[in-house]
């Protein structure tokens, strides 16, 4: 659940900072990596 909640905040940051900010974030946290891609698939 926390992963999905974070993913809701990330798209807003991604629009401001761009992919360079979003990419290193998921790269450093592997658990969030799965959660982010899972939520991304559910959202789209």
Curated annotation (Swiss-Prot):
Pfam families in UniProt: PyrBI_leader (PF08052)
Top-level lineage group: Bacteria
GO biological process terms, semicolon-separated: pyrimidine nucleobase biosynthetic process; pyrimidine nucleotide biosynthetic process
Keywords: Leader peptide, Pyrimidine biosynthesis
Family annotation (InterPro entries): PyrBI_leader
Name of the molecule in the record: pyr operon leader peptide
Source organism (scientific name): Shigella flexneri
């Amino acid at each position: 659940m926390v992963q999905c909640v974070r993913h809701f905040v990330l798209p807003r940051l991604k629009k401001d900072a761009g992919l360079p900010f979003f990419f290193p974030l998921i790269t450093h946290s592997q658990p969030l990596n799965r959660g982010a891609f899972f939520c991304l698939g559910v959202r789209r």
